[in-house]
Design a protein with these regions (language model features):
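Active-site-proximal specificity loops/subdomain of glycosyltransferases
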Residues: 23, 90-190
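Short, acidic, metal-binding catalytic loop of nucleotide-sugar glycosyltransferases
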Residues: 39, 62-74, 83-86, 112, ...
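A recurrent flexible, glycine/aromatic-enriched loop bordering the glycosyltransferase active site
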Residues: 259-284
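Acidic donor-binding loop at a coil-to-helix junction in glycosyltransferase catalytic cores
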Residues: 301-307
């Protein structure tokens, strides 16, 4: 009996249809396509957004040409050169220095993008130019020598930019993603759509290890790799770089701590596996499942994390430690958020002589997890009896955040959080409150200095068998303990 005989459609066919619908929605026929068809042997398409990145993108492309264990027929790169039509508007609570930096980047990027488009054209046309730097010429020669396919999507020139509301990093990623999925549909393969950033260097075995991860784990619909920041000494001195590196390790570990607490409370009899967090420099998913998650959110910051949340709701996303990338930790205002903006803020704090880095309080995390059930019930009662008001919701949070008679919250931050919370649909909030909103609340409350929080987090995580028995989290614990023990003032 055929699969269609009894009215059942095979899963693969359903996914294909979803992929076609996604492409139709996000890549209208009026959009100019890549002129070269996808190689029938291609299994991975790498999407790279580039907004004013001439200085860095050829570092990435050179590393792409130096990949080991893969043939050039197995992969391609799609570089989405993009910029908005108009200068950015100032965001709510955005520091003046950050906004000014984003405006300056916009002005530089428009010219920079045209230069990048011209240089990238040399890869396919073979034309020589005296305007190339030595590094650019070397990268182009490597790409040609190894037969690497680099395709260009021009969303920077007049009349070609993305619509203003999606002319951002998420919009650029999604534009490249839609074309990559369409190309895989044309060769009838549910290939891999991978993402990285234009300032990132790929480990020589990155693509091979990423592809192998999907082969070993057919149950995985997404894979994220290891991200190791490289030091741009023009941006940060050694001590500030060390602080940012410690902060990155801390964020990864406290996220794992939240996962473990949640697992202990809700799934104590199941095996513990960290759900990998997707990050822009190293995230990937199967093409049709990417479409199932509706692609990359078209937002100016946090598109990678939001994509991961969407993808995780569709299936398993795993961490592959051997798929390593090296982004530059540098000053950058190309996106509305991210590490580049964080560097700008850190340098400003350093000039002012204030507390450099504060972080989420690990002491509060387990307190919150223990109170989630009571909190959800209380909020439901408030909604049913008083309505969804800042006053009613605020009282619940004030109770939650008072521990042993001591308030552990910042009054202004709490009011701001609650006012934003009640603007959302209450039923959706209550449905997701089990963990998501509590974590958001924790991050908005009193934040200790990094050097005070690290010992507390290490003590708590090292006492949890779930984390110590997991290879990924144990490596994080060891790394944070080792790096925090090095000389320096955190």
């Amino acid at each position: 009996m055929s699969a269609r005989y009894d009215g059942m459609i095979p899963e693969e066919e359903r996914l294909k249809e979803t992929a076609r619908e996604y492409v139709e929605k996000h890549l209208p026929q009026t959009e100019e396509r890549i002129g070269i068809p996808m190689d029938p042997a291609c299994v991975l398409s790498l999407v790279i957004p580039a907004y004013g990145e001439r200085e860095h993108v050829f570092r990435l492309l050179a590393s792409l040409a130096e990949q080991r264990g893969t043939s050039p027929e197995e992969f391609e790169a799609i570089v989405v050169v993009n910029n908005p039509t108009h200068a950015p508007t100032r965001l709510e609570n955005e520091p003046e220095t950050v906004y000014r930096s984003r405006c300056e980047h916009f002005l530089r990027a428009r010219q920079d993008n045209q230069e990048t488009l011209s240089i990238l054209a040399h890869i396919t046309t073979g034309a020589a130019s005296s305007d190339l730097s030595d590094d650019e010429r070397e990268a182009i020669d490597l790409l040609k020598e190894h037969g690497v396919k680099v395709h260009i999507v021009d969303k920077a020139s007049d009349g070609k930019t993305l619509p203003e509301e999606v002319a951002n990093v998420g919009g650029a990623r999604n534009r490249g993603t839609a074309e990559a999925i369409e190309r895989f549909l044309e060769i009838d393969r549910n290939g891999i759509v991978a993402h990285t950033d234009a300032d990132t260097r790929l480990d020589p075995d990155y693509l091979r290890n990423l592809i192998d991860a999907y082969t070993r784990r057919p149950d995985a619909i997404g894979v994220t790799g290891e991200v190791i920041m490289e030091h741009d000494k023009d941006a940060l001195d050694d001590e500030l770089f060390r602080l940012k590196h410690l902060q990155g390790l801390y964020k990864k570990l406290i996220l794992a701590y939240h996962h473990a607490l949640f697992h202990q409370r809700s799934r104590p009899h199941e095996s513990f596996e960290m759900q990998a967090k997707t990050v822009g420099p190293s995230m990937s998913a199967r093409a049709y499942q990417t479409a199932l998650a509706d692609g990359i959110p078209t937002v100016g910051k946090g598109e990678d994390t939001r994509f991961g949340e969407r993808l995780s709701s569709c299936g398993k996303v795993i961490f592959e430690p051997s798929a390593v990338v090296y982004p530059l930790l540098r000053v950058s205002s190309r996106a509305e958020g991210g590490s580049g903006i964080g560097v700008i803020k850190l340098r400003e704090k350093n000039k002012e002589g204030g507390q450099l880095i504060t972080v989420e309080n690990p002491v509060l995390a387990d307190v919150f997890e223990r109170r989630i059930t009571d909190l959800t019930t209380a909020l439901q009662h408030v909604f049913e009896t008083q309505g969804w008001t800042p006053e009613g919701v605020g009282v619940i949070f004030e109770h939650l955040l008072t521990i042993d008679g001591r308030k552990v919250y910042n009054e202004e931050k709490l009011q701001h959080f609650v006012s934003r919370l009640v603007k959302n649909d209450p039923q959706e909030v209550l449905a997701s409150f089990d963990r998501f909103w509590v974590v958001k609340a924790v991050r908005r409350m009193t934040r200790p200095p990094l050097h005070q929080a690290i010992p507390d987090l290490l003590e708590k995580t090292k006492s949890m068998p779930l984390l110590m028995e997991n290879e990924y989290t144990r490596t994080l614990i060891d790394s944070l303990e080792r790096e925090a023990g090095k000389p320096g003032d955190t």
